[in-house]
A protein has these predicted regions:
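Extracellular lectin-like interaction modules
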Residues: 1-363
C-alpha cells in the first residue's frame, strides 16, 4: 500500500519479475508511472484525480485491475487478469503516439467508465472478457475487437473498425465508424440509434428491441458499401421505424424482417432478399443513386427484385413504394400480381408483362 497524497509514484524497474508480489494499492493525485512490467495479485489506483502512466508494456494480475484516475499508454500494452475485472474509471488515452492495447479478463469484465481517445486515440484495441462495457465515449481512429459480449452505453464516433463476437446491447444514439462494423452475436437495441459506417455493416445474428425498451427507431447507413442481415430482425420484439441505406443490401436465408406497425425504408442501388419481409405499416424501397434503374419480376434493372424476392414481401403493408421522386432511372416491371397498395415513382415506368394489382396503385 502506497499513499503519497499529492506526490508522484514511480516504479522504474520490473515489479514481481521473479515472483509476483501481493496486492498493490495506490493512492496519490500526482502521476503514477509504471516504467516496466508488473506481476501482482492485484493493482488498484484509488485516486480519482491525477494520472497513471503505463509505459512498461504489461500488467498481469490474478485479481482485479482498477484505475481510478486518467490513464495514458506510453507503449503497446497488455493487461491480463485471471478471470477478474479490468476497470478504467477515468479517461484512457495514448501518450506520444497511438498505442495498441490488449485486454484479457477471461470470464471477468472490462469496464470503461471514462472517455477513451478524447486526447490521443488508441491504436488497435483487443478485449477478451465475458462483457466489455463502455459507459462514456469512444473517439478517434482506433480499431476495437471485442471477444465476448458488449454493452455500449456511450457513443462511439470516428473509430476505424468495430467487431463484437458475442451479443451486443446498444444503449447509445450513435455508433459511427470510418471502416467496418461487424456484430456476430444477437443485437438488442434500447434507445433510438444511428449506426453509420464508411464500409460494410454486417449482422451475423438477430436484431431486436431490448426487452426493457419500446420500439426504438433505428438507422443503419453503410454509405456505398454493403449492409448484410444474416439473422432475423424483430422476430422476438420488433424495432421502431427503421431505415437502411447502403450501396447494397443483403438479407440472408435467416434474415427475415418483421416490422409489425413500424415503417421500413430501404435506400440502395442493389438488393438481395433471402427471407420474408413483413409489416402492417409502410415499406419503401428507393434507389440510392438517382440514375439507378429498377427491375421488378424478371425485368432488367440495377436495383432488381425478381419474382422470388417480391414473394418474400408479405401481404399486409398499408402501402408499398418502389422508387423515389428524386430518381431518374427507369422502372421496368415483368409479369407479377401486387396485392398491397403500390406506388411506383421514377422518371419512367414500363411493363414487359402483365402487371396485376389487387390493391390500389399509382404510377
Amino acid at each position: 500500500t502506497i499513499n503519497t497524497g499529492t506526490g508522484a509514484i514511480t516504479f522504474t524497474g520490473a515489479v514481481g519479475a521473479t515472483k509476483a508480489v501481493g496486492a498493490i494499492s495506490l493512492t496519490g493525485t500526482g502521476t503514477t508511472t509504471f516504467s516496466s512490467s508488473v506481476d501482482a495479485t492485484s493493482v488498484v489506483q484509488n485516486s480519482s484525480t491525477g494520472t497513471t502512466a503505463i509505459n512498461g508494456g504489461r500488467i498481469t494480475t490474478s485479481g482485479v485491475q482498477t484505475f481510478g484516475n486518467a490513464v495514458t499508454l506510453g507503449a503497446t500494452t497488455n493487461l491480463n487478469t485471471t478471470n477478474n475485472n479490468i476497470t478504467f474509471t477515468g479517461s484512457l488515452n495514448s501518450s506520444g503516439s497511438s498505442r495498441n492495447l490488449v485486454l484479457n479478463a477471461g470470464s471477468g469484465a472490462v469496464l470503461y467508465t471514462g472517455a477513451v481517445g478524447s486526447s490521443l486515440a488508441l491504436g488497435a484495441v483487443s478485449s477478451t472478457a465475458a462483457t466489455t462495457t463502455n459507459s462514456s465515449t469512444w473517439v478517434g481512429s482506433s480499431t476495437y475487437d471485442i471477444y465476448g459480449n458488449a454493452v455500449f452505453d456511450g457513443s462511439i464516433s470516428g473509430v476505424t473498425n468495430l467487431y463484437v463476437s458475442g451479443t451486443t446491447t446498444i444503449n447509445t444514439g450513435t455508433i459511427n465508424t470510418t471502416g467496418t462494423q461487424s456484430y456476430d452475436g444477437a443485437v438488442s437495441i434500447k434507445v433510438n440509434t444511428a449506426l453509420s459506417a464508411g464500409s460494410n455493416i454486417t449482422f451475423g445474428s438477430t436484431i431486436n428491441t431490448h426487452s426493457s425498451a419500446t420500439t426504438p427507431t433505428v438507422s443503419i447507413d453503410s454509405g456505398s458499401a454493403i449492409t448484410t442481415l444474416n439473422g432475423a430482425v424483430g422476430a422476438v420484439k420488433v424495432l421502431g421505424a427503421t431505415s437502411i441505406s447502403a450501396g447494397s443490401v443483403v438479407t440472408g436465408s435467416s434474415g427475415s424482417i418483421k416490422m409489425d406497425g413500424s415503417a421500413l425504408s430501404i435506400t440502395t442501388d442493389a438488393i438481395s432478399i433471402g427471407a420474408t419481409v413483413s409489416g402492417t405499416s409502410t415499406l419503401t424501397i428507393a434507389p440510392k443513386t438517382a440514375s439507378t434503374t429498377i427491375g421488378l419480376a424478371g425485368a432488367s434493372g440495377t436495383l432488381n427484385l425478381d419474382t422470388t424476392e417480391l414473394n418474400y414481401l408479405s401481404d399486409g403493408f398499408s402501402a408499398m413504394t418502389i422508387g423515389s421522386a428524386a430518381a431518374t432511372g427507369k422502372i421496368t416491371v415483368g409479369s407479377y400480381t401486387f396485392k398491397d397498395t403500390l406506388t411506383l415513382i421514377n422518371g419512367t415506368a414500363t411493363s414487359n408483362g402483365g402487371m396485376q394489382f389487387t390493391g390500389a396503385v399509382s404510377v
